[in-house]
């Protein structure tokens, strides 16, 4: 969908529908809507639809005016009460409004910049989040359907209206919103893709397309080379599958000043997780195609950074394989030597994510990174702890965990810090190796983070994002239909963009 500005007197604005927002229990309309109503919407004042509109969250009302009018419809989108207003509600309301426009087959709906006046959010931020919510809320993963497909009725163009010329920064916001939405949509589609399609090779092809478009350096390390490099953890998991495994390495601006150490993102890319020999139960097993959501988030962040033309030096490392049972699969009781030289006793082959990530983290140190962020659907325990709308973050610096939480909040991705006290390592102690890959059921998410911590030097800022709960949704969330959510794309993107200003060493 294209997004255009239209600058000029409100009497000259043209659109199939003009979208305004309303708060529940408000004594009067938001100031931007009130002004437009007084000056140009007299026909709307007497509308029973407007009088019945209550402003409840995601309530949508369509008011019809004279067919010959420049703007023959007004779409009212409810935000709920002011006390509960947040960025996510604005995104959801914008998505609800644009989905109603889709149902009405409107080709050219519009947001008015003044419609965001009076909200507890800066106007530029409100515009950007409404656009992102609308764009992502309209998208559906239907690429593989062949029957009962309705012709796409999504708007082809979205217009932003304003009476006066805006600043260059404000002018650029629709492009930034489209870039963010594109990254989220890419990640969602990869996660929602079936595992017989979204194989490790498929993810590698996606990475190559990004590299070709943006001039990134790319290396795809196959299993044989990974074994020769000593990646015992990655290889142990990969040997159980017939699908060729690979470690994907993407680097933005490899010719950047080498005095600028890169930010490294490490994303878990288990394209299907049966649990291996420690076989998972059958319930919801089909959803284990989502176990590559960490890698998808990294690719989504690269998609956004590329569209933004960012000059940040960023590396993405994605260990991609299936975790399957079979004659070559690794087994409980095996001892694996990792790329770091540390040995791991395998207690559960269903804790495969940390086995592939540990080698990716060791490989990341070759870049002498300014910081490392790994993102993974690592533990079911995090769902028990935080549910499906909040992810966990663990870090080797408290200030870094706080920064991740804060940046996530800025973009509507909720994260919560969990501790990594040294005492948690006791759960990993082994009689036959340096440590085990799991403990008992106690503190499962934290113990997973503690395992990964062993592979990052204390001198390197590192954070682990456990997105096992947030990577997938079983219900339509307004901006996110059932399936992959794209969680983490915006947090990773902002970490890359804001890192120089965070002052963390």
UniProtKB/Swiss-Prot annotation:
Mn(2+) 1 binds at residues 273, 350, 352. Disulfide bonds: none annotated. One of its GO terms (cellular component) is cytoplasm. Its cofactor is Mn(2+). One of its GO terms (molecular function) is metalloaminopeptidase activity. It is an enzyme of class 3 (hydrolase). CDD domains: Peptidase_M17. One of its GO terms (biological process) is proteolysis. Keywords: Aminopeptidase, Cytoplasm, Hydrolase, Manganese, Metal-binding, Protease. It holds the Pfam family Peptidase_M17. It is found in: Cytoplasm. Mn(2+) 2 binds at residues 268, 273, 291, 352. The lineage of its organism: Bacteria, Pseudomonadati, Thermodesulfobacteriota, Syntrophobacteria, Syntrophobacterales. Binds 2 manganese ions per subunit. Presumably involved in the processing and regular turnover of intracellular proteins. Catalyzes the removal of unsubstituted N-terminal amino acids from various peptides. Belongs to the peptidase M17 family. PROSITE patterns: CYTOSOL_AP. The active site is at residues 280, 354. It comes from the Bacteria. It catalyses: Release of an N-terminal amino acid, Xaa-|-Yaa-, in which Xaa is preferably Leu, but may be other amino acids including Pro although not Arg or Lys, and Yaa may be Pro. Amino acid amides and methyl esters are also readily hydrolyzed, but rates on arylamides are exceedingly low; Release of an N-terminal amino acid, preferentially leucine, but not glutamic or aspartic acids. This is Probable cytosol aminopeptidase. Its EC number is 3.4.11.1, 3.4.11.10.
